[in-house]
Amino acid sequence: MAASPGSGSANPRKFSEKIALHTQRQAEETRAFEQLMTDLTLSRVQFQKLQQLRLTQYHGGSLPNVSQLRSSASEFQPSFHQADNVRGTRHHGLVERPSRNRFHPLHRRSGDKPGRQFDGSAFGANYSSQPLDESWPRQQPPWKDEKHPGFRLTSALNRTNSDSALHTSALSTKPQDPYGGGGQSAWPAPYMGFCDGENNGHGEVASFPGPLKEENLLNVPKPLPKQLWETKEIQSLSGRPRSCDVGGGNAFPHNGQNLGLSPFLGTLNTGGSLPDLTNLHYSTPLPASLDTTDHHFGSMSVGNSVNNIPAAMTHLGIRSSSGLQSSRSNPSIQATLNKTVLSSSLNNHPQTSVPNASALHPSLRLFSLSNPSLSTTNLSGPSRRRQPPVSPLTLSPGPEAHQGFSRQLSSTSPLAPYPTSQMVSSDRSQLSFLPTEAQAQVSPPPPYPAPQELTQPLLQQPRAPEAPAQQPQAASSLPQSDFQLLPAQGSSLTNFFPDVGFDQQSMRPGPAFPQQVPLVQQGSRELQDSFHLRPSPYSNCGSLPNTILPEDSSTSLFKDLNSALAGLPEVSLNVDTPFPLEEELQIEPLSLDGLNMLSDSSMGLLDPSVEETFRADRL
């Protein structure tokens, strides 16, 4: 009996049975554990899918993929929860639905009361039901009661925490309910049904239509056509263009002038991140087009070379200039520019309603007649003798010049490539269409005469009569027949300036003033009460400065001009309206020190507010 336990324990059959029982028990436990882990994994994956639906559309501030939302809504349905497919096909295609109290009169909640606002976005609307009214109100509080994790899908898609949403709220001009629903819901019946839907216990949201409020739909018919909200979408694009425009479809169609959904209103823009400046109106101090190919804008030195002279031109604003006269400043250019002056007197058309009426027209350039492109033989015309010096050729457009000057003088005329050998010299045939007194006073470039010899004949010239009421374009000291360009002359000028047209009716003689390199422009009401001399950096002006007078807030310009321009023989700005003094403003010539002062690179040309405006668009 004592050996029985040993023999029993040494029985391999019993030992193998124990091993088998242990293995079976371990296999059952392993199977149960695997089943449990499978259930946990499935539930975790399902939860992660729901989390992904709620969070990934605006996670990290990235914009949702809205390029195909409006066109193909059915492509989004298979990737979502099963309840979305049920909701998307249950009432699909129906236009008219019965009221909700037919189905569930006992389940009417406080959500149907007027004043309750529903949260939603473009994503929940595409697979919840067929949209009747294309308006998704945003910026509303979330739902009060949630029953299923998938029930707040559209609520979670309201992008309130991303940086693009902050960009939207910062640039929005109407932060409160941009649809104008009077604080009530702007949802049509299918959206109310989705928001007030009941959970049937299987994760499916049964959507029932709610009562349709006509005042919330802003008198829009129930099947709102696509063309109607597309036209409203085009009308609402009058606001400022945003920097996060998405090309293609519009994710947020809307009612009326909606500026709250601004990041997706850029269907008329280029689709990039740069702002659209075609409808942006602001008062700018820049007179010229932003031509980046010009590399001569920083050079303000006059020097002794006559190569600088042909590039002396000015930008003129058609709507803002009432008289632009020129004066002479530097002895190094007085010989070549002597009596070959170009002054422009334009009609004063005050446009007080346009904020940039004082902006200078970028395509209007006046060239000095000593330009080498006006060569010797093509400028031939009758020359008449008169006792006073020559009156400058004045391009004075009348009221019709708004249409004519847009094609006349272009900013792309090549001026610099002409050689110096074509410069104006003592040869009379170069300026044969000018009176002979002017030709006699045109001196060769190398020996520069003294300023006394040049300014003496100008002091003897009679001044232009002050008759702004009779001739608002600036009165002339010469009859009109003195400076009529013949058609042959106009064609010869056009040969040298292919993109420049000369209006024969608008060529009239103007008041004779000496040539000054920075031409002083006197503008309309925005310009007339305040001036400030600044060089124009964006012109094809070579190394001679263009001085314009943009808007500035100081009314002491006349003192500054009289102190900076000392000793001018005769230049007058005929002002007919807004100056407080009736007397004529006398401007003295600009000396070399004044030119050096104007060429200071530390003088800022851009207003800091304009730069901040462009930076704000790239947030």
Curated annotation (Swiss-Prot):
Phosphorylation/dephosphorylation states of Ser-273 are required for regulating transduction of CREB activity. CRTCs/TORCs are inactive when phosphorylated, and active when dephosphorylated at this site. May be phosphorylated at Ser-391 by MAPK3/ERK1 and/or MAPK1/ERK2 or by some cyclin-dependent kinases such as CDK1,CDK2 or CDK5. Following adenylyl cyclase activation, dephosphorylated at Ser-162 and Ser-273 resulting in its dissociation from 14-3-3 proteins probably promoting CRTC3 translocation into the nucleus. The keyword Phosphoprotein applies. InterPro entries: TORC, TORC_C, TORC_M, TORC_N. GO terms for molecular function: cAMP response element binding protein binding; transcription coactivator activity. Predominantly expressed in B and T lymphocytes. Highest levels in lung. Also expressed in brain, colon, heart, kidney, ovary, and prostate. Weak expression in liver, pancreas, muscle, small intestine, spleen and stomach. Keywords: Activator, Cytoplasm, Host-virus interaction, Isopeptide bond, Nucleus, Phosphoprotein, Transcription, Transcription regulation, Ubl conjugation. There is a cross-link at residue 232 (Glycyl lysine isopeptide (Lys-Gly) (interchain with G-Cter in SUMO2)). Coiled coil: none annotated. It is found in: Nucleus; Cytoplasm. The keyword Glycosyltransferase does not apply. It holds the Pfam family TORC_C. Changing residue 282 to F: Translocates to the cytoplasm. Represses basal TORC3 activity towards CREB. Transcriptional coactivator for CREB1 which activates transcription through both consensus and variant cAMP response element (CRE) sites. Acts as a coactivator, in the SIK/TORC signaling pathway, being active when dephosphorylated and acts independently of CREB1 'Ser-133' phosphorylation. Enhances the interaction of CREB1 with TAF4. Regulates the expression of specific CREB-activated genes such as the steroidogenic gene, StAR. Potent coactivator of PPARGC1A and inducer of mitochondrial biogenesis in muscle cells. This is CREB-regulated transcription coactivator 3. It comes from Homo sapiens (Human).
